[in-house]
Amino acid sequence: MSENQDTQKSFLETVKFDDRGLVPAIVQDHETGKVLMMAWMNLESLKMTLEKKKACYWSRSRNKLWLKGESSGNMQDVHDIMIDCDGDTLLLKVSQKGGACHVGYHSCFYRKTTDGEQMEICDTLMFDPEEVYGKKS
């Protein structure tokens, strides 16, 4: 397909959702390039994200739309949405307010290993999840 033909298709027509109607979305800080999280999107959440310029995902555990930051206030303003060469993965470039991770860190990728056994925290704790979401029963 030529470059011209490739850009003639609409963005939504290009996205290849899986058999559950989902596509993975990698979320990246628009200024630093730091990877913040990975989430799932369906057609409805993608359309809402495009319309509102706020990240909206599909929660597989709750089986419903999830506007990022709706309960915590840690919203994601969307600057760009990119699609990979196969059309089966999205990259959202966002400005993150507060932490992206539900356990309180700036990024969900807040742990690292150098030896394959021990882990260390390599990110900034932005908030106390118990204060934001309440204690788990």
From Swiss-Prot:
EC number: 3.5.4.19
UniProt catalytic activity: 1-(5-phospho-beta-D-ribosyl)-5'-AMP + H2O = 1-(5-phospho-beta-D-ribosyl)-5-[(5-phospho-beta-D-ribosylamino)methylideneamino]imidazole-4-carboxamide
Database matches in SUPFAM superfamilies: HisI-like
Gene Ontology biological-process annotations: L-histidine biosynthetic process
Pathway field: Amino-acid biosynthesis; L-histidine biosynthesis; L-histidine from 5-phospho-alpha-D-ribose 1-diphosphate: step 3/9
Cofactor note: Binds 1 Mg(2+) ion per subunit.
Keywords: Amino-acid biosynthesis, Cytoplasm, Histidine biosynthesis, Hydrolase, Magnesium, Metal-binding, Zinc
A cellular component term, taken from the record's GO annotations: cytoplasm
Stored Pfam families: PRA-CH
GO molecular function: magnesium ion binding; phosphoribosyl-AMP cyclohydrolase activity; zinc ion binding
Catalytic class of the enzyme: hydrolase
Binding site for Mg(2+): D84, D86, D88
Cofactor: Mg(2+); Zn(2+)
Binding site for Zn(2+): C85, C101, C108
Stored InterPro entries: PRA-CH, PRib_AMP_CycHydrolase_dom, PRib_AMP_CycHydrolase_sf
Subunit structure as annotated in this protein's UniProt entry: Homodimer.
PANTHER family: HISTIDINE BIOSYNTHESIS BIFUNCTIONAL PROTEIN, HISTIDINE BIOSYNTHESIS BIFUNCTIONAL PROTEIN HIS7
Protein name per the record: Phosphoribosyl-AMP cyclohydrolase
Lineage: Bacteria, Pseudomonadati, Chlorobiota, Chlorobiia, Chlorobiales
